[in-house]
Amino acid sequence: MGRKSFSTNLINSLSVNEETAYKFVEKGLKDLSISRTSFSWGIPVPNNKKHVIYVWLDALTNYISALKFPNTNDKLYQEFWPADLHVIGKDILRFHAIYWPAFLLAAKIDLPKKVYGHGWILSGDEKMSKSKGNILDPIEIINKYGLDSLRYYLIKEVSFGNDGNISQERLEDCINSDLANNFGNLCQRVTAFAIKNCDSKIPKQIEFNEDDHKILNNYKDIIELIREKIDNQDINFYINFIVNSLFEANKYFNDQEPWNKKEDLLRLNTIVFTTLEIVRKVSFLLYPIIPESSIKALKIFNLKENDILLSSITNHEFLKSGSEINSIDILFKKVEKND
């Protein structure tokens, strides 16, 4: 393979991080030495004791040697190579998006289908460092606020692919506004109302009006769009859709005022059913982000982990009328903040 065609193939393999990867290759490929003489530690080059293998050559091969390469018929290799998505830090993007594909192309081995460089998690606009004293210990955070809270906060606040500033104060704000108020409070309110006014059952007689159809139609074509966005690592779209869905659901429940519809049971039942359906849909969507809390929320409907199907998001009558609903414990406690 000539240098020009090799360069073309390499450029074609770079599907993300164009600013870093494309510019490097478009300048023109230069020879890369795969050995070093400036130090002695490393894998010796055969027949030349003065040289050791360049660390980025032998280190990168671990991705396939761990899968039993060169035995390409091994089950591990067959199942996991080529990788659908290879996620690495942006500071080592060049080695993974240029050198590694170059090595694989030269050896006629399949390339990862996509390489994605994530950003850094910053504290006060700086990389975390013990010497600077700006480290947030993830174990301490998890012990204090819970794993789901930290996971949700990072996914929502750190735009995938970019650097993101985090702080304990912002985490607490996120827990209070999104998880405790928007999600947890909605689950508690509609469940308590249904237990009291619908005999602890999913309402039987319902009749959707324009307001109900409007909010339910937000989920009409969402499945394919979500799949497309996730395939392109657009996590922001996914989380923002959930946040907006919860905002709309709370607004719907407040605006419809089911507590003032006790003389119109058909309307009351429909409002409760619609809100419960949205709680179910959003709990399904939240499962990849806050799995433990989502499963707790689904106990309202006696649903379990294996009942979670993305395809059912568009089904507006997934819940079985007349089936029992249960009260649940508080999903997220509000964080008391000292003024």
Predicted segments, located by residue:
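An alpha-helix initiation/capping motif
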Residues: 15, 19, 23, 173, ...
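Short, glycine- and charge-enriched coil/turn segments that flank and shape catalytic ligand pockets
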Residues: 8-13, 48, 71-80, 199-217, ...
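Structured secondary-structure scaffolds
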Residues: 1-196, 238-242
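Basic, alpha-helical terminal appendages of large translation-related enzymes
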Residues: 228, 233, 243, 247-339
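A glycine-rich phosphate-binding loop feature that marks nucleotide/adenosyl-phosphate handling sites
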Residues: 119-121, 170-171, 204-210, 299-303
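Alpha-helical scaffold segments in carbohydrate-active enzymes
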Residues: 59-62, 182-193, 218, 225, ...
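Residue-level detector of short coil/turn "hinge" positions at structural boundaries
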Residues: 110-111, 149, 202, 294, ...
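Active-site-proximal binding-pocket segments
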Residues: 93, 154-157, 161, 167-170, ...
